[in-house]
Design a protein with these regions (language model features):
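Protein maturation boundaries and topogenic segments
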Residues: 1-59, 76, 107-109, 128-148
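Phosphate-binding glycine-rich loops and adjacent basic patches that engage nucleotide phosphates
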Residues: 26-28, 72, 81, 100-105
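Surface loops and adjacent helix of pleckstrin homology
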Residues: 27, 41, 76-77, 84-86, ...
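Loop/helix-junction capping segments adjacent to catalytic residues or to phosphate/diphosphate-binding pockets
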Residues: 30, 82, 124
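Mid-length scaffold segments of soluble, non-membrane domains
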Residues: 55-90
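Acidic/glycine-rich C-terminal interaction modules and beta/coil loop segments
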Residues: 90-142, 146
Length: 148
């Protein structure tokens, strides 16, 4: 019977965002700054398995960095990641194991029905590497309730 109940509490063990417990909140309409849980694309899942980062079965917990109509960029020379002209962080060419990371370079605008997921950790695998995700992939909006 419990298997049919929606997930209410999420536990984040990664360093992409503060580790701890996050509570699901009503609605899926996202605004910049919201925390979301989403299913990564098949392409991302394949890369996760290939690079030994996990089994590709886990959902991602990130913040919404940009929504439809907003612009983001990765400078090809400096590898600076910016949203609406504001510096967010660096982009790395390899992970901690030396595996090549996807190379997203240039200026982009978030299309309607999509959002750009980001994290606070400089080493997080987020939109700075793979770009936007469809809003349809969002499983929940969450808020932190106990983090460290």
């Amino acid at each position: 019977m419990l298997e049919n109940m929606p997930k209410v509490i999420y536990f984040n063990v990664t360093t992409s965002l503060p580790q701890g417990f996050y509570l699901r909140i009503p609605g899926k309409e996202c605004s910049r700054g919201d925390y979301i849980v989403y299913e990564p694309s098949e392409e991302v899942k394949t890369l996760i398995i290939k690079n030994g980062w996990g089994d590709g079965e886990r959902d991602f917990l990130k913040k919404v960095g940009a929504v439809a109509g907003e612009k983001y960029s990765v400078d090809a020379k400096t590898l600076r990641f910016e949203i609406e002209g504001k510096y967010i962080g660096q982009v790395y060419e390899t992970d901690n194991k030396g595996n090549a990371l996807p190379k997203l370079r240039g200026e982009f605008e978030v299309p309607e029905g999509y959002l750009l997921p980001i994290a606070t950790s400089a080493r997080s695998f987020d939109g700075r590497y793979v770009g936007v995700i469809s809003e349809k992939r969002v499983k929940a909006r969450v808020i932190p309730i106990l983090t460290w």
